[in-house]
A protein has these predicted regions:
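A short SAM/SAH-binding and catalytic strip from SAM-dependent methyltransferases
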Residues: 140-154
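Conserved beta-strand signature within the Rossmann-like core of class I S-adenosyl-L-methionine
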Residues: 167-177
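Conserved SAM/SAH-binding beta-strand->alpha-helix loop
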Residues: 102
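Conserved SAM-binding loop of SAM-dependent methyltransferases across substrates and taxa
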Residues: 80-93
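N-terminal auxiliary segments of SAM/dcSAM-dependent transferases
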Residues: 1-25
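Conserved class I S-adenosyl-L-methionine
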Residues: 69-79
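Class I SAM-dependent methyltransferase Rossmann-like catalytic core
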Residues: 29-54
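C-terminal lobe and adjacent flexible extensions of AdoMet/dcAdoMet transferase-like proteins
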Residues: 232, 236-314
């Protein structure tokens, strides 16, 4: 982009950001090539970072050889391909299908993905609405990110049923980290578990979510801001935090002996306190310096990871 195009993209980025804030970061229609470029600058870095973080947790939950068998992916509502690129970092994907109904997002996404992925990845783009497209081919991984909060429950159920049917291994849903999006994620969770899906992450099992109705489960990732990104956001902070929630479902059972850290660890002198969701529900665990390796692990741990060295409750 030349200087004039960059300035236009920055101005549009700020307007897009305002629209996303008004709609709680849910999907906003992109009506021009310039708006798609503005989205690339202002929102894609964060959605990519969230997807990369989530897929990393999913891979950890799968372990080997399961994660190594993920070779093909369907990205439903692909946008510019943020989730696709993120998944390629966690899995050895060599075949990718991106479904995107917005013309300008799809057009820029095709160009960006060719540039970002090189020639080694076989990518097919489809001009279709994920809520109505008939899927005829199966994929190891199906993913839908930053989309389900826009769908009515009936449409969402139909869409997820269709995606689950063509999933060979895992289905991953990623949404903005808000209470409203978490509620919609719980709806999707209940629907998929009822269809026979096996809970993979972040929940330790398919039991009813143990959180009270006024609480919710979300994670966050910190990403750096470049010069153009700072201008688009209208600030000088060198980083931003993207909150997200996710759920991953599997066709086969994976065994996890740990518990998920669902809050930022509290680090104090001589001990650390972790809020965990495990097979026995939610518990708060205090790990002290005298616990040796467990204490060192707790000091390094971050929200979203699996903690294996559970010692004692508060």
């Amino acid at each position: 982009m030349d200087d004039a195009e960059k300035k236009e993209a920055v101005d549009l980025s700020r307007r897009l950001s305002a629209r996303y804030r008004e709609r709680d970061k849910s999907a906003v229609a992109i009506g021009s090539r310039q708006e798609a470029a503005a989205y690339l600058i202002s929102r894609m870095p964060a959605t990519y970072a969230a997807a990369r973080d989530a897929f990393g947790f999913v891979r950890d939950s799968m372990g080997e050889p399961g994660a190594g068998n993920i070779k093909s992916m369907l990205d439903a509502g692909a946008g510019l391909g943020a989730a696709s690129l993120a998944a390629c970092e966690s899995f050895g994907i060599n075949e990718l299908k991106c479904v995107e109904r917005q013309t300008h997002m799809r057009s820029l996404g095709e160009k960006f993905m060719r540039y970002a992925s090189g020639e080694s990845l076989n990518i097919e783009w489809a001009d279709a609405d994920v809520a109505s497209v008939p899927f005829t081919k199966s994929f190891d991984l199906a993913a839908v990110s930053y989309l389900i909060n826009e769908l009515e429950e009936g449409v969402l159920s139909k869409t997820l049923k269709s995606l689950w049917e063509i999933t060979e291994s895992i289905l991953v849903i990623i949404e903005p980290g808000t209470p409203e999006c978490f509620r919609r994620l719980l709806f999707a969770r209940d629907m998929l578990l009822g269809a026979g899906a096996i809970m993979l992450a972040p929940c330790p099992n398919g039991n009813k979510c143990p959180l009270p109705d006024d609480d919710w489960c979300g994670f966050h990732v910190r990403l750096p801001r470049g010069r153009l990104h700072k201008k688009a956001k209208g600030g000088e902070a060198p980083f931003e935090d993207e909150k997200y929630c996710y759920a991953a479902f599997s066709k086969t059972r994976h065994i996890s002996k740990g518990a998920r850290i669902i809050r930022r660890p509290e680090l104090m002198k001589g001990h650390a306190r972790l809020r965990l969701c495990g097979g026995d529900g939610i518990q708060t665990v205090t790990v002290s310096k005298s616990d040796g390796d467990a204490y060192a692990a707790a000091r390094r741990a971050r929200c979203g990871e699996i903690f294996y060295k559970i010692n004692k409750k508060v």
